[in-house]
Amino acid sequence: MASSGPPTLPSPASDPLSSLKRKQLNSVTRMLALNNVASKSPGSTANTSTGAEASSVDIGSYNMLPRGPPAQNQWKILIYDKTCRSIISPLLSVSDLRRRGVTLHLLLDSEREPIPDVPAVYFVEPTRSNLSIIAQDCALGLYKAAYLNFVTRLDRSLLEEFARLVVQSNSVEKVALVFDQYLDYVCLERNLFTLNKTNSYVLYNDPTTTEHMMERAMLDVANGLLSVISTIGQLPVIRCAKGGAPEMVARKLMKMISDRPMIFDRHKGRAGAASASAAAHRRPLMVIMDRNTDLITPVQHTSTYQALIDDVLTHKGNRVEFESKTEDAAGRVKTMGKRFDLDADEDPFYSRHKFNPFPEAIESNGVELQNVTKKTEEIRSKAIGGGVSERESQSGAVVFDADASASAGTNDLATAVDSLPALIERKRQLEVHTSILQAVMTQVASRDIPQFYELESALATGSYKNDQSKAKRDVMELVTDATKGKVADKIRLIIVFCLATTAPGSDIDEVVCGMRDSLGNSAAGGGPSPKIAREDEEKLSQGLAAITYLKRLRSMNMITTMSDQLSAVESSYAGAGASGDMLSTLMKSATNQATGLLAKATERVSSMLGKIHKHHVTCVVENLINQKPGTEDDEYLYLDPRISSRGGEVNLSEVRQIARAPVGEVVAFVIGPGSYSEHANLNQQIDNVIYGCCELVSPEAFLKQLASLQ
């Protein structure tokens, strides 16, 4: 039976250890403990009775290499390639590695000195070149022992080749263990992952991509998804569109699951009978989609905090960089570069507000910073008045020394003093966000991003469906206004106009010409003009190439315009109905509460609050969860690894007749580039959803990929 209303899934909050990132971290921790199943990390779900561990496949059963003795935690060296370094970086800091016994971490292809009394943990891709380097390390006796961990499955042929190399060099005894870890993805947040496949849209859509290249690329994607499923530890139901890349990946994934059942067997016995029964009752749902079904979302302007950081600042791998300008007493402007690492799993403010509209984040930052500052000062005053002195330790930490002669108050004072370091850390985090909010606000206000956001949202939700001429006029007015936005902002608006409406090509050409004329270029495409900077000229050339490519796809019916897709979708507006009063009240509050530099421009972004419409990926996932008739639930292939007949495929005519298990959690995966705005939209509408893509890109980075396909 199809259900109605919003998807209802079990809340992840009930199990803080259930996130994909936590499970991946547990696997990496076991790897650093030399894959010793008796070594349990804090929060680990290791079960020593199973003899096998999550996301770790011991292929010592090949009996070609000796097994090492059980190893307890000890000092060791971590050696990885660039791919595996990207996997480790979001999970463990340098200090985290040291707490796990890692004294040194080095790239496999770097020059490395011998340390013969310390074991080495290798974490690398299973390639011939990597195996050759490892075999050479063993032959030279660089380390006491080599614990080999491959990010995905090591082919038998490569294993045999490696075995011959170490036998020839008489260094077999150096190889302690060989493991397939199945960790071939980068987990940036608790339920956000990427396969780290750069320039993916170009590769998958370039007409010069050969059949062999495409086959290899889809195999890599399937390998990555197998790693994700292995980490989750439950067989999912797989849904995907018929034909094209999604079906190719889904069928490869089904075959991999069928060929390697042992990677799921190891999860049996981890939990008690009750929880195991509950897990068996609910099934993960993996939805595989193609980027080409929605090309608007990756270029559209957004309104949420995290997505705006990724859009207007330099943001990659949880690190944000920007320039901050300050003015000294003499009126001289000083520019300073700032860089911060953001971790939503360790930063309460970021965790709460990354998916919220930007103005809400501003308001909350001002309120929380004011409260924390007030509480910190109160505790300091009480502590000093109670005979407690404050000093700074050599490490820079704040330390409080009680005066032994003072009758120091009481347990309440001691408790308050004990809480002060945590308050100071929270204040520091809030001040970091104040700086980031200021940098984002500067860009948002100077580029008038709210106007682009509002118009693009109206286009994408079909508001202009019955008045295409007005759509053209409004777009033309904004892209020809020299005071509004950057060149890239205008290009993005034109792309949304192209994809979200049925406007003829002549209308799009007219809008493009109007924009070019306003920038000082002739419609015929003359050289650079004094009115436009060289950087903008490059952005213009790139943007026009992207528009040309998308117009060609649209004319060939190779992509679907969003006006058709969204015509049956109701826009989901937070606070709809009384949104005007709510906006004015909240923005007035934000103006009063936000710290000084932020408050100046707050009024200019009020339109970015309250209007959250469902993106295409969100609609598809909701329809599949709710089993809604007449939607993708009737069209997407239904593949179940637990069904032995027909390769696990259920005929679409039979899908509504079978008893389907309730959905436990959802993995929504996009083949091609993904975006933080898509990640936010999914999480705003659906609980317990894991979002993944081949790569996370900013809107301008996606434009660059589109342009290269002209």
Language model regions located:
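Extended, well-folded catalytic/binding cores that form a central cleft or groove in large enzyme
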Residues: 2-710
